[in-house]
């Protein structure tokens, strides 16, 4: 039975949409996952509860966007009752400069995941990281490059595989 990977992102800008789609493509390509892509304005708590794995994405607006922060704040009951604990999760972001706070945005997303007791899935080192992505998650700086899309696909695939391993008997 395939795992359900939920990708929730704030669609402010085409770069974040491209990374979300690439992450979904990577998860689907594993053959072990069904992917649900949701813009934050459309995502529901039911989507979150039904997910076996979660990926959050936000453009860097000096941190995550207000829209995504509001949605995360609405999940407080799930945090309190532990509904998300033990589920694997990952993060992605975009920004206009490599040193404009991208890493801090990823860490803000990861902080929420950890607070919920989720298992954070990152990216292992590759030579591509000299110009794209981060250990913390997938990134794009300025425009989206083929390397950025590849990193997002790899993160989606890693998340799906970890979720499948956790579901295995």
What annotation goes with each model-predicted range?
Residues 90-131:
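Short, glycine-/small-residue-rich phosphate/pyrophosphate-handling segment
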Residues 85-88:
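Short, proline-enriched alpha-helix->beta-strand connector loops that line the catalytic pocket
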Residues 1-83, 129-131, 136, 140-169:
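N-terminal beta1-alpha1-beta2 submodule of the flavodoxin-like/Rossmannoid cofactor-binding fold
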């Amino acid at each position: 039975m395939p795992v359900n990977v939920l990708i929730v992102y704030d669609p402010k800008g085409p770069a974040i949409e491209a990374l979300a789609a690439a992450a979904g493509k990577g998860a689907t390509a594993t053959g072990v996952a069904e992917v649900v892509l949701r813009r934050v304005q459309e995502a529901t708590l039911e989507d979150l509860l039904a997910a076996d794995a979660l990926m959050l994405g936000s453009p860097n607006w000096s941190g995550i966007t207000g829209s995504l922060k509001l949605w995360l704040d609405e999940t407080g009951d799930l945090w309190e009752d532990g509904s998300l604990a033990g589920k694997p999760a990952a993060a992605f972001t975009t920004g206009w400069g490599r040193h404009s706070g991208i890493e801090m945005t990823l860490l803000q997303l990861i902080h929420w995941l950890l607070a919920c007791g989720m298992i954070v899935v990152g990216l292992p080192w590759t030579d591509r990281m000299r110009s794209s992505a981060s250990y913390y998650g997938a990134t794009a700086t300025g425009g989206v490059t083929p390397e950025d899309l590849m990193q997002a696909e790899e993160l989606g695939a890693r998340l799906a595989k970890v979720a499948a391993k956790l579901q295995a008997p």
